[in-house]
């Protein structure tokens, strides 16, 4: 007993959706920048410290609750500094500053975000290891026609991850 439903396409709904002008302008800039290019990007990796013992101590459901609470704090702070959450990788968050929207002080924004993230996560009795690096990276679509992601690639993003791995918690 299947029924076919019609879902309206976003393009068909644009006449009926109100988008504030500042957001519309940012969306247009971001769309133009999504073609893929080498650009200055600041990558921030934030990884929960002591996650393996934590995951052994609690049920899977409780671990997911803890991780989600941590991720909420990270996401809220990154967005507050106008960064972009790229993805969650296990117990790690990858965020970009300067992609797709660029600010002249993106590296500073990422550092301020990292400090605020540490403060917020301490309230949850957790600590993070954070790594940040800025450099020229490819930012744009990666993948195949059947599955694409928008991400950044290059040695400078790998350095951010290595710095995160070497960092002390908190």
Q: Which ranges hold each PLM region?
A:
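Catalytic beta-strand-to-alpha-helix segment of the class III nucleotidyl cyclase homology domain
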Residues: 96-170
């Amino acid at each position: 007993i299947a029924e076919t439903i019609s879902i309206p396409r976003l393009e068909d709904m644009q006449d009926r959706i109100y988008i504030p002008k500042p957001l519309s302008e940012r969306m247009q800039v971001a769309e133009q920048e999504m073609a893929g290019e080498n650009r200055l990007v600041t990558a921030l990796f934030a990884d929960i410290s002591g996650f393996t013992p934590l995951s052994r101590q609690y049920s899977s459901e409780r671990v997911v609750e803890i991780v989600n609470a941590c991720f909420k704090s990270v996401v809220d702070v990154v967005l507050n500094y106008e960064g972009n959450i790229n993805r969650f990788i296990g117990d790690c968050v990858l965020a970009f500053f300067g992609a797709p929207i660029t600010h002249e002080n993106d590296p500073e924004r990422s550092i301020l975000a990292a400090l605020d993230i540490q403060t917020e996560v301490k309230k949850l009795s957790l600590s993070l290891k954070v790594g940040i690096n800025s450099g020229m990276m490819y930012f744009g679509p990666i993948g195949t026609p059947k599955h694409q992601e928008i991400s950044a690639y290059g040695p400078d993003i790998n350095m951010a991850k290595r710095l995160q791995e070497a960092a002390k918690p908190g």
